[in-house]
């Protein structure tokens, strides 16, 4: 997201923030549901017209905010957004494995599944420690997402770009396709040579 933000801020005002329980928003006692995350986002954007961009779990926040804010949201872009509440979503994803762990291991297990053990071990100890402490937020978010749909396609009226990487996991590709097929105004976009972490 940082690279994308740098490109966009040449011509647009860009607001990036750390979700509750992560990076500069740590520590946070929660809760970590999509609804609570949307409250945070709504507080940040105020009454401005916005385009919302959400990567992974952030896509659900963007879609839920679009449903809530209506015409204030000009458009949404999602990338490999998990649809964990759907019965076809696999129970063997990085997210599913993370929530089966203790809080202290959840974020590490999640990261190792995403970037591999070699890259994880190459991270500085400080960075690994920062990621591990985010386990409570990660478990809270993923458990909430598995329990119920955080938005309804009928409530989203803005255009949505539904992105996935050509090297992405099958369930992320299928999730992006589902969004593009079921949202009112949507387009499917494949990023060549990209995986879940995007370019």
Predicted regions span which residues?
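Active-site loop/oxyanion-hole signature of alpha/beta-hydrolase fold enzymes
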Residues: 6, 15-53
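A short beta-to-alpha transition loop/helix N-cap that caps and shapes the active-site region
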Residues: 24, 82-90, 117-119, 170
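Catalytic nucleophile serine of serine hydrolases
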Residues: 56
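Helix-loop "lid/cap" segments that line or gate small-molecule binding pockets
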Residues: 94-99, 107-120, 140-144
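The serine-hydrolase catalytic nucleophile loop
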Residues: 1-5
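Alpha/beta-hydrolase active-site loop signature
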Residues: 19-23, 83, 195-196
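Conserved serine/cysteine hydrolase catalytic core
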Residues: 127-182, 187-190, 198-199
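Flexible "cap/lid" loop of the alpha/beta hydrolase fold
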Residues: 60-102
């Amino acid at each position: 997201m940082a690279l994308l933000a740098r490109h966009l801020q040449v011509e647009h005002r860009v607001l990036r923030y750390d979700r509750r329980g992560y990076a500069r928003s740590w520590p946070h006692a929660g809760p970590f549901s999509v609804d609570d995350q949307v409250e945070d986002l709504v507080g940040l954007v105020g009454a401005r017209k916005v385009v919302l961009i959400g990567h992974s779990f952030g896509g659900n926040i963007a879609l839920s905010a679009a449903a809530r804010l209506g015409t204030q949201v000009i458009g949404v872009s999602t990338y490999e957004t998990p649809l964990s509440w759907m019965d076809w979503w696999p129970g063997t994803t990085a997210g599913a494995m993370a929530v089966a762990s203790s809080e202290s291991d959840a974020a590490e297990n999640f990261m190792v599944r995403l970037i591999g053990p070699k890259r994880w071990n190459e991270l500085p100890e400080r960075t690994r420690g920062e990621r591990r402490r985010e386990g409570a937020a990660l478990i809270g978010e993923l458990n909430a997402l598995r329990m119920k749909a955080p938005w309804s396609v009928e409530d989203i009226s803005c255009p949505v770009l539904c992105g996935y990487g050509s090297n992405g996991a099958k369930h992320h590709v299928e999730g992006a396709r589902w969004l593009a097929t079921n949202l009112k105004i949507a387009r499917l976009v494949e990023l060549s040579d990209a995986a879940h972490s995007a370019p």
